[in-house]
Amino acid sequence: MNNAEILKHVDHTLLKPVATWDDIKKICDESIEYNTASICIPACYISRIHATYGDKVNICTVVGFPLGYSSTEGKIAETKQALADGANEIDMVINISDVKNKAYDKVTEEIRALKEVVGNKILKVIIETCYLTEEEKIAMCKAVTEAGADYIKTSTGFGTGGATLEDIKLFKKHIGPNVKIKAAGGVSTVEDLNMFINEGCDRLGTSRAVGLLKGEETQGY
């Protein structure tokens, strides 16, 4: 797979808490130059990006990030504001405590509530695989499918681990046919980029892809 094809799968990501406007502009400029699938950035920058770049960049942001503890009502409010400001894609974090309490129906209903707000735009559901058992991961595949979300996403990049090939294979067995997969966290080499795409991931969340494909040493999400 050539570099251009890889980058079409990349959500070019900058979610570090110290991100400046200059950092954000660099991500936007790179996304335009290299035709990445989207930029994934903090919600506080959406309106400024939209005012500066218009439709030249596809804006993705995060909701309930990174711990997922916000109430459903809070996540809905975040989502509505993000969409109003110009976001086209929402990456939400589930309430992991609900999963641990086996309140799977509650998780499903929260995802469904956010998908109703997102409508025909894209909703990705971060399940933070590093904290879940195999049984819980399978339950979340079912929840994401039943709730009508567009993607299941492995990780925030802020947990104790990121995407693994084993989790991608597990997802493929248990998600519905309309659900796509996003790998994030630990996508840190060119080999990783190719491996996850070849395994069936439609999106990759990483801050490193552009640098890696340019042959640069990079650090980040």
Swiss-Prot record:
List of catalytic residues: 91, 153, 182
Compartment(s): Cytoplasm
Gene3D superfamilies (alphabetical): Aldolase class I
Alphabetically ordered keywords of this record: Cytoplasm, Lyase, Schiff base
Family: Belongs to the DeoC/FbaB aldolase family. DeoC type 1 subfamily.
Role noted for this protein: Catalyzes a reversible aldol reaction between acetaldehyde and D-glyceraldehyde 3-phosphate to generate 2-deoxy-D-ribose 5-phosphate.
Protein name, UniProt field: Deoxyribose-phosphate aldolase
Name of the gene encoding the protein in the UniProt record: deoC
